C-alpha cells in the first residue's frame, strides 16, 4: 500500500482534488496522511501583545521585520476527515495526536506513537495500526501525550508496544 503524503495545510477542496488526481493515475489502494494536532487553546490578546513587545527588541537588534499576525486558514482537521470519509479512502494515517475518528468506519486507521503511553492511547481509540516512531526516525517527533524527552525512545525500546 502506498501512502499519499498530502500537504499539512491542504484545504478540504485541495485534498479532494489530490485524492482524485491520484485515483486517475492508479487503481491501487493508497492512504491519506493528516496532522492531528492537539487543540492549542485560545491566546489572550493582551498576552499576545506582551509577547510581541518582549520580542520586539530582538527583532530590532537583528533587523527583522515585525511579523504579520497569524490568520486561521478557515478549515479544520475534521473538515479534512470529512473528505476522507466522502471519498471512501481505504486508509488514513495521522500523527501528532488522535483526530476525531467518528464517521470513518471501514477505513484502516494508522496512528503514530513515540511512547508506550501513546501506543496505548491509539489502541484504546480503536486504530488498526500503531506506527511506532523511534528516535532513529529523525526529523519532527510525532509525540502528542509525552514530553519531548520521553518521545526520544529508540525503536528497540518501543518494540513491545
Residue ranges with predicted function:
Residues 1-161:
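Active-site entrance/lid segments in N-terminal catalytic domains of soluble metabolic enzymes
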Amino acid at each position: 500500500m502506498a501512502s499519499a503524503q498530502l500537504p499539512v495545510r491542504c484545504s478540504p477542496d485541495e485534498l479532494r482534488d489530490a485524492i482524485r488526481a491520484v485515483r486517475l493515475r492508479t487503481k491501487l489502494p493508497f492512504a491519506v496522511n493528516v496532522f492531528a494536532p492537539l487543540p492549542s487553546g485560545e491566546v489572550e490578546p493582551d498576552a499576545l501583545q506582551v509577547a510581541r513587545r518582549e520580542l520586539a527588541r530582538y527583532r530590532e537588534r537583528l533587523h527583522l521585520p515585525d511579523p504579520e499576525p497569524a490568520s486561521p486558514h478557515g478549515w479544520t482537521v475534521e473538515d479534512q476527515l470529512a473528505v476522507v470519509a466522502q471519498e471512501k479512502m481505504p486508509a488514513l494515517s495521522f500523527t501528532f495526536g488522535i483526530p476525531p475518528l467518528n464517521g470513518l468506519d471501514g477505513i484502516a486507521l494508522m496512528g503514530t506513537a513515540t511512547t508506550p503511553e501513546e501506543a496505548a492511547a491509539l489502541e484504546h481509540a480503536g486504530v488498526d495500526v500503531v506506527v511506532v516512531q523511534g528516535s532513529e526516525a529523525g526529523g519532527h517527533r510525532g509525540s502528542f501525550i509525552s514530553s519531548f524527552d520521553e518521545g526520544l525512545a529508540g525503536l528497540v525500546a518501543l518494540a513491545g508496544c
